[in-house]
């Protein structure tokens, strides 16, 4: 027999009236429910036993037949079939409606589906359905038009005038007739022709109408089924009625809603029989329509039907919708039996794979197992007796429990489960008390602490579940974070402090300088108190004496034998690195052993250290006053400049904030220096921060330095800093300023948690069906990766980006020519080292972004699974892992929107350019002019530099072994020295011989320069490290004259485009261009020569401060006007979570930039409707128009040459523009870089492939640009694979394929547009999704995880994949062996 679960697809359609009647077991004719005396269902009522089945098992209503032997017999007295009472859960009834009624889902929801089919507006449709207007069905030979609406008077007039020669009616009957008369094929071809005529300007309505018509055609649904003649009644057990203690009844709201429908229906039937006046019948029909609407969707109506306690009744739609609806409450989230929860306490004595379960809890959880063992051991013979033994808690029960619990894993879960490590399996150990004991090292994965957190325990029951728990979920198998492959099980707090103390070195202690021949001697000396843990000693390791400390020896002695000697002071960072290295070299079993040893040692020596904090440990630097006085002097100078009118108010504010930030930073450095020297580095506060056990530099600064600048509630920074620290104590005003920040912090945290949770939910929804389904998709495309650099420092090395991926190309050594990496070979750590030694720093790798698997991704494109550092298994749910990896750190991201001027976090802005390395200036780009001994950049520019990695004087060289400009790698001979020794290169780079020096230099790098930068070096110069090569104003952007001449104002009119403000603080007059836009006025400054000819023109953006007068002589390099950075302060740089949200939802940013659509020459045109037209002429002379809001600060001038994708004005980039102008690959790179940037700033490491999985899902669809011979509709959005398949079919038949362009869809929209209607319906907008799916007759292939959970199947991933389900286990016969 086939099980009900053995189906592979599920389909949803509109039910026809015949279908509804075929489901039904009888008509519900009365609105009664239960007889109040007998408490039995009323005949023909909503709970009738004849229709829905008997309420008593194997017994009819009247009691004539009472026994299972009469099964299936229908009683001749009461007509009730003798069955099991459970049939009341599945038998349906129906109500025959006296007048047709429209289904609210199809007419009320926007866009109204019936309205689209008939081309009637929603409001008109409403007035027809609610019997307010007539609609002409057949105009006959009258002046009326088909589908014309008539009110009462017009209808009466037409009746008088034309008599019976036309037909018009109202209500659902009229709509039903119209729907029956529709010819879908004819309508479809008519609309397709209209679309071709309209071409580009297609309106959305046409597209929607066509889609709905096509859906009806394909699905086999008939449009008239949206109007109902018969109403299904759901089984009574699903809308139960129960008696409460007081004799009253509690009933489901649906019964009340059905009752209203039945009452009105019966009343209407009577009125029709009585031939009542039309107006009464019509009113009753309208009420019937309303009552059916309420039954289907009560919340969507204007006038909600309310129950007894004045609360809206819950209709069928409400039962599905939202968090409390059927999908999310009962199908996706269920409560589980065999589970318990309790408070957690730390269990330092546990092994990593163990957890402590309170004995009483374990007994309850494992009760069935204990009962079985009791019966097997013949202590008892039935379950009842076994239960009573367990309740008495006899000794035998505890013995049995001990045996049952051995090797039976339990799952521990801590809410919120943000990633998969929030549920792990442990072996239970029975403990006294009522609290669950948790191993201290797994706290990080759970984000647990012991301040009252609770955890839940679940018991896996079946052998398969236990096997999976052991093999996949055991805590010792989850040592790495799936987001990035770093260890997630590592010591923190006490353990770190203990080991830091143990491995530190202290001067002048017992036993300093002694030599020991082996570890045992060291331990003996420590035990005899003749050697201090922190003493510097010499000990023999592998036959050589090394300098170390006694504590290091103790640490290494305890480690497993294979690990090489660890000789450094261990901070938390060092410990994590150690764990990583040991994992890579020796595997997980050694790591697990090592972790438990580290835990024991850490706790032991933290106890021995016994550190305490006192006020004397908090040392305030004596120099503090000096720093503060210096800052006050600088601020006085800034104030003076402001009073003179040299700088604007915003610049003054920015400068003040900058001064305090710098002062605070300098003071903190001094303070840390003092703390480090205090007590030979054994200052407890410093030790805690330095070891990474607790506290940070920032917190110590507030204790012993100065609290610094605080932010207002608006996010602006209060320029009055808190100079005191907590040791000195705050003044009243300082305390009051502090309260702002504290309150904001708490409010942010609460909002952030909900926001991050919602982000995770949306990400899971879009990626839930991305599973590794095949081994190799065979693609030849990949993406380029290289180390991510910020100027000269490497932010993310190539290793992070490439390890674990597969190469697309064959890579040979540039020196020997041998193959280092072959096509489709995994890039391992060793391969990366090899590539680095030969100087290869760019790779093309396979990526999820370019994977061509039809569903999900393939093994080769995904690469390594970071949770175990092995190639990913087929069946791994990588989409969910990706969503969790991005969503889980979401709670750590800030909600705050940073201001450009906001420097509470940002530190001070520098006004100098100086590089950390020596370098050679290789070239300049950007418009610059020569002014007194330097170069002044009048627009943004770029420096091209090559860093000097190594240099040697030529006079010490006897013979060169390399040529100028030759590439060298590590270990290559460079020259022979005077002593005849060959000197080898210790770096990779290029040889440069210059100024009597032999240098090794890096590849060229670009450094961007701001407008107004003054450069003091020339191309070709060699510059030492740290030398200042240029200066600029960080708080203002100048507009600079590039020619000599006379100033002439154009369209700068006082009171219109120019505003003169008297600064009340300084009494100076400030001239500012207004940000109002005038059609005919375009404020600019012209520069004219002696002959009065215009030689330069500068457009002035809104809010620019003028620095020149009309008619004034001007020289090259003079500042004409400047834009204060403060005016940019209002343009928030959205950081943190809101930014990630915007990127994933592909929202168009507020302050938008305009990107050049093509490469070419810029031409300025006039301002029209508040927008400036800028044309870019491409190489063929074609003009491409760009409209930029007037008053925006332009980054180009008339006649400039731009590249496609260059920004023409300042602002934020729109991801959709990137896709349109630069294409899909650039968009992927842009989104990846922007999202990673937010996480990286918060110190969160997420591997690119996780974000790649989500971006891939956002770019799954394409938009049809040309239809060809396919069935697509112009502008329709379809799945890439559907598109390719249709085209393939059309090409095979010799037709013309369709053309489409890629589009980017935000995650919420993409989740709703997903192929699976079950998944989409359980996400958001449930009723809308189901409405559209039913019209289209959608089939859900049950490919994703969510739909299978809802249906109750095993999820198709991991061991639940069909691939693995079909595995048969056969015994080997002896002959084969």
Swiss-Prot record:
Coiled coil: none annotated. Pfam families: RNA_pol_Rpb1_1, RNA_pol_Rpb1_2, RNA_pol_Rpb1_3, RNA_pol_Rpb1_4, RNA_pol_Rpb1_5. GO terms for biological process: DNA-templated transcription. Signal peptide: none annotated. Its cofactor is Mg(2+); Zn(2+). Keywords: DNA-directed RNA polymerase, Magnesium, Metal-binding, Nucleotidyltransferase, Transcription, Transferase, Zinc. It catalyses: RNA(n) + a ribonucleoside 5'-triphosphate = RNA(n+1) + diphosphate. Binds 1 Mg(2+) ion per subunit. Binds 2 Zn(2+) ions per subunit. Zn(2+) 1 binds at residues 60, 62, 75, 78. Zn(2+) 2 binds at residues 777, 851, 858, 861. HAMAP family: RNApol_bact_RpoC (MF_01322). DNA-dependent RNA polymerase catalyzes the transcription of DNA into RNA using the four ribonucleoside triphosphates as substrates. The RNAP catalytic core consists of 2 alpha, 1 beta, 1 beta' and 1 omega subunit. When a sigma factor is associated with the core the holoenzyme is formed, which can initiate transcription. PANTHER family: DNA-DIRECTED RNA POLYMERASE (PTHR19376), DNA-DIRECTED RNA POLYMERASE SUBUNIT BETA (PTHR19376:SF54). This is DNA-directed RNA polymerase subunit beta'.
């Amino acid at each position: 027999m086939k099980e009900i679960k053995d189906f592979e697809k599920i389909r949803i359609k509109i039910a026809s009236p015949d279908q509804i009647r075929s489901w039904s077991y009888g008509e519900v004719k009365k609105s009664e429910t239960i007889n109040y005396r007998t408490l039995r269902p009323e005949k023909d009522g909503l709970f009738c036993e004849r229709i829905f089945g008997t309420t008593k098992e194997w017994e009819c209503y009247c009691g004539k037949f009472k026994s299972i032997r009469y099964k299936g017999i229908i009683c001749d007295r009461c007509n009730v079939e003798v069955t099991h009472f459970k049939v009341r859960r599945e038998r349906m009834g129906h109500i025959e409606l006296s007048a047709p009624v429209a289904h609210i889902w199809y007419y009320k929801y926007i866009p109204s589906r019936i309205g689209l089919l008939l081309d009637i507006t929603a409001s008109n449709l409403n007035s027809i359905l609610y019997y307010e207007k007539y609609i002409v069905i057949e105009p006959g030979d009258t002046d009326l038009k088909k589908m014309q609406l008539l009110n009462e008077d017009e209808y009466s007039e037409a009746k008088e005038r034309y008599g019976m020669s036309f037909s018009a009616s109202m209500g659902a009957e009229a709509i039903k007739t119209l729907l029956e008369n529709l010819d879908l094929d004819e309508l479809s071809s008519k609309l397709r022709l209209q679309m071709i005529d309209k071409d580009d300007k297609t309106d959305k309505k046409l597209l929607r109408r066509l889609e709905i018509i096509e859906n009806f055609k394909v699905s086999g649904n008939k449009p008239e089924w949206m109007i109902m003649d018969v109403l299904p009644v759901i089984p009574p057990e699903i809308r139960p009625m129960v008696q409460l203690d007081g004799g009253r009844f509690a009933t489901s709201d649906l019964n009340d809603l059905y009752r209203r429908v039945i009452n009105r229906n019966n009343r209407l039937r009577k009125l029709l029989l009585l031939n009542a006046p039309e107006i009464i019948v019509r009113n009753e029909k309208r009420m019937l329509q309303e009552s059916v609407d309420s039954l289907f969707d009560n919340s969507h109506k204007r006038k909600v039907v309310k129950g007894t306690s004045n609360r809206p009744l819950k209709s069928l739609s409400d039962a599905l919708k939202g968090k409390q609806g059927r999908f999310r409450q009962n199908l996706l989230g269920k409560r589980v039996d065999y589970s318990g929860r309790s408070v957690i306490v730390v269990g330092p004595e546990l092994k990593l794979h163990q957890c402590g379960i309170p004995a009483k809890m374990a007994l309850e959880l494992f009760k069935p197992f204990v009962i079985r063992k009791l019966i097997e051991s013949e202590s008892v013979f039935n379950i009842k007796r076994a239960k009573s033994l367990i309740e008495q808690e006899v000794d035998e029960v505890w013995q049995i429990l001990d045996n049952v619990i051995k090797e039976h894993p339990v799952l521990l879960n801590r809410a919120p489960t943000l990633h998969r490590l929030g549920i792990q399996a442990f072996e239970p150990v029975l403990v006294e008390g009522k609290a669950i004991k948790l191993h201290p090292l797994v706290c990080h994965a759970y984000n647990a602490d012991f301040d009252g957190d609770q955890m839940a325990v679940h018991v896996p029951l079946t052998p398969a579940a236990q096997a999976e728990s052991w093999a996949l979920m055991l805590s010792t198998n989850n040592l790495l974070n799936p987001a990035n492959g770093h260890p997630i099980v590592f010591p923190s707090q006490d353990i770190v402090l203990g080991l830091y103390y143990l491995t530190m070195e202290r001067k002048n202690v017992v036993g300093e300088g002694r030599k020991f021949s082996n570890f045992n001697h060291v331990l003996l000396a420590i035990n005899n108190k003749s050697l201090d843990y922190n003493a510097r000693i010499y000990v023999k390791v592998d036959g050589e004496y090394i300098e170390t400390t006694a504590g290091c020896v103790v640490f290494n002695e305890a480690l497993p034998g294979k690990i090489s000697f660890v000789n450094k002071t261990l901070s938390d960072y060092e410990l994590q690195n150690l764990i990583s290295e040991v994992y890579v070299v020796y595997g997980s079993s050694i790591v697990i052993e090592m972790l438990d040893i580290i835990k024991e040692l850490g706790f032991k020596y933290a106890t021995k250290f016994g550190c305490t904090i006192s006020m004397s440990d908090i040392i305030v630097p004596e120099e503090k006053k000096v720093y503060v006085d210096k800052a006050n002097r600088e601020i006085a100078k800034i104030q003076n400049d402001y009073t003179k009118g040299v700088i604007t108010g915003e610049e003054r504010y920015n400068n003040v904030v900058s001064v305090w930030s710098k002062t605070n930073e300098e003071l903190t450095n001094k303070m840390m220096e003092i703390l480090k020297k205090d007590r030979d580095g054994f200052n407890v506060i410093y030790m805690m921060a330095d070891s990474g056990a607790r506290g940070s530099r920032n917190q110590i600064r507030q204790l012993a330095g100065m609290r610094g600048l605080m932010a207002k509630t608006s996010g602006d920074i209060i320029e009055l800093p808190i100079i005191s620290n907590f040791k000195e104590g705050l003044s009243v005003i300082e305390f009051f300023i502090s309260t702002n920040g504290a309150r904001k912090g708490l409010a942010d945290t609460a909002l952030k948690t909900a926001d991050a949770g919602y982000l995770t939910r949306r990400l899971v929804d879009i990626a839930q069906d991305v599973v590794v389904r095949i081994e190799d998709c065979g693609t030849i495309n990949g993406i380029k990766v290289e180390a991510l650099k910020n100027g000269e420092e490497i932010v993310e090395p190539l290793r992070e980006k490439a390890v674990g991926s597969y190469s697309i190309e064959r890579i040979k050594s540039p020196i020997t020519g041998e193959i280092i990496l072959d096509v489709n070979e995994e890039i391992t750590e060793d391969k990366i080292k090899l590539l680095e030694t030969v100087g290869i720093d760019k790779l093309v790798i396979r990526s999820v972004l370019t994977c061509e698997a039809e569903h999900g991704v393939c093994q080769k494109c995904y690469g390594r699974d970071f949770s175990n550092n092995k190639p990913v298994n087929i069946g791994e749910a990588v989409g969910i892992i990706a969503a969790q990896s991005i969503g889980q750190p979401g709670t750590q991201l800030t909600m705050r929107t940073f201001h450009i001027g906001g420097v509470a976090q940002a530190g001070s802005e520098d006004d100098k350019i100086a590089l950390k390395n020596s370098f050679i200036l290789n070239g300049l780009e950007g418009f610059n002019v020569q002014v007194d001994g330097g170069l002044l950049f009048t627009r943004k520019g770029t420096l091209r530099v090559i860093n000097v990695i190594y240099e040697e004087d030529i006079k010490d060289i006897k013979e060169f072994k390399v040529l100028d400009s030759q590439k060298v790698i590590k270990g290559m001979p460079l020259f022979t020295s005077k002593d005849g020794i060959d000197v080898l290169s210790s770096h990779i780079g290029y040889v440069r011989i210059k100024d009597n020096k032999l240098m090794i230099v890096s590849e060229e790098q670009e450094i961007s320069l701001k407008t107004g930068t003054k450069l003091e070096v020339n191309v070709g110069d060699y510059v030492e490290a740290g030398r200042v090569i240029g200066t600029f104003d960080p708080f203002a952007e100048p507009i600079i004259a590039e020619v000599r001449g006379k100033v002439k104002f154009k369209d700068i009119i006082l009171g219109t485009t120019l505003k003169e403000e008297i600064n009340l603080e300084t009494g100076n007059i400030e001239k500012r261009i207004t940000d109002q836009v005038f059609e005919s006025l375009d404020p600019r400054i012209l520069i004219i020569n002696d002959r009065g000819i215009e030689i330069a023109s500068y457009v002035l953006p809104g809010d620019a401060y003028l620095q020149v007068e009309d008619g004034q002589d001007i020289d090259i390099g003079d500042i004409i006007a400047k834009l204060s950075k403060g005016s940019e302060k209002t343009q928030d740089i959205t950081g943190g979570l809101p930014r990630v949200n915007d990127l994933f939802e592909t929202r168009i940013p507020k302050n938008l930039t305009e990107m050049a659509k093509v490469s070419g020459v810029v031409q300025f045109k006039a301002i029209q409707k508040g927008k400036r037209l800028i044309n870019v002429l491409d190489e063929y002379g074609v003009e491409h128009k760009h409209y930029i809001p007037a008053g925006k600060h332009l980054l180009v001038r008339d006649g400039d040459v731009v590249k496609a994708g260059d920004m023409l004005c300042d602002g934020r980039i729109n991801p959709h523009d990137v896709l349109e102008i630069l294409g899909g690959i650039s968009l992927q790179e842009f989104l990846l870089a922007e999202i990673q940037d937010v996480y990286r700033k918060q110190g969160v490491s997420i591997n690119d492939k996780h974000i790649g999985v989500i971006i891939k899902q956002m770019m799954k669809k394409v938009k049809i640009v040309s239809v060809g011979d396919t069935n697509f509709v112009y502008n329709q959005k379809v799945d890439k694979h559907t598109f390719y398949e249709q085209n393939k079919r059309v090409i095979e038949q010799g037709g013309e394929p369709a053309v489409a362009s890629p589009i980017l869809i935000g995650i919420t929209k993409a989740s709703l547009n997903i192929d699976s209607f079950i998944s989409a319906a359980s996400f958001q907008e449930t009723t809308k999704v189901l409405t559209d799916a039913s019209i289209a007759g959608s089939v859900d292939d049950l490919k994703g995880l969510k739909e299978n959970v809802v249906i109750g199947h095993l999820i198709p991933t991991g061991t639940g994949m069909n691939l693995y389900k079909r595995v048969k286990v056969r015994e080997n016969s002896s002959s084969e062996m």
